[in-house]
Regions:
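Catalytic core of pol beta-like nucleotidyltransferases
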Residues: 2-75, 83-285
Length: 285
């Protein structure tokens, strides 16, 4: 039985008075945090490619470095985004010269997901006397190459980040607001409620037809008919999920509204309302 249950998103949470003290001294990223994140990425890139430091610019980004860091956001995640100088990359890695900018980014991101992410799913930045990183807060750190981000001091502003700290240069590119947006247009809330009603309808239909399928003899006409309906519902759930998730990317394009854009609001509200989890349960059910 699939039912909508409240989810998690720090987007609507009350901000803290300070940035995460496990990561920052005041507004400055702690040197050991900066060094470790930088080395995790550059060591990986240097192992798989050549001369990474010459073509890479690295940022820490997202709500984890905002004043809403203490909210229950599900995973305690940190996003490390980087941009590259594609001309310099190709000079050092000529085997990729036949690929487009987007194809290179996709290739590197796929490698990161497979080879680096599993090793950075539990990262701790507190150092004890026995040389183990075992104290303090655990973080799930994910690394991304965004083809829209350039290898220059403010290159990440192309995707309108809510907050971005330049790890390479050790400075803020985009400081997070101390008082995030809380007054959203009624149209935003209306669309979010429509999404919730639609997901409720899909889950109710799925539960009813799936129950009928489970009581049918496998491969009987009744079973096959129920399976066909289930597949249609899964396709509808996938389409809705894709529209909400993919739509969020529009918020961070050059002509988007960034963190307060409707499409980001819609995604965050879908997470907070449990719609993302429910849709995935239907899709994978």
């Amino acid at each position: 039985m699939i039912n909508i249950k409240a989810g998690k998103s720090g987007y609507f949470s009350k901000p803290s008075q300070t940035l995460d003290p496990h990561l920052f001294d005041g507004e400055h990223l702690k040197p050991d945090v900066r060094t470790r994140l930088n080395l995790l990425l550059l060591d990986y890139l240097d192992y798989h490619y050549h001369n990474a430091e010459s073509w890479t610019m690295v940022w820490l980004a997202g709500s984890g470095i905002s004043y809403q860091w203490s909210a229950d956001r599900g995973n305690g995640d940190l996003d490390v985004l980087f941009g590259i100088d594609y001309d310099k990359f190709l000079e050092s890695n000529p085997d990729y010269s036949y690929m487009s900018r987007e194809e290179i980014a996709e290739c590197i991101d796929n490698d990161l997901r497979i080879s680096l992410w599993p090793k950075t799913s539990h990262i701790n930045f507190s150092y004890d006397a026995e040389d183990y990183w075992t104290l303090g807060q655990d973080y799930e750190v994910t690394f991304f190459l965004n083809p829209m981000v350039d290898n220059r001091a403010n290159g990440i502003t192309n995707i309108r980040p809510y907050a971005a700290y330049n790890i390479t240069l050790d400075e803020w590119t985009t400081k997070p607001p101390k008082t995030p947006e809380t007054n959203f247009p009624e149209e935003f809330e209306r669309q979010a409620n429509d999404n919730k009603l639609l997901v409720k309808t899909l889950s109710d239909r799925y539960n009813s037809i799936n129950s009928d399928r489970s009581m049918s003899i496998p491969n009987s006409p009744r079973y096959i008919n129920a399976q066909t309906h289930v597949n249609h519902i899964k396709a509808e759930a996938q389409s809705l999920y894709d529209s909400i998730h993919t739509g969020r990317k529009a918020a961070f394009q050059s002509n988007g509204g960034g963190y307060s854009d409707f499409y980001n609001y819609q995604w965050q509200k879908a997470k907070a309302d449990g719609l993302v989890t429910t849709l995935n349960e239907i899709i994978n059910g």
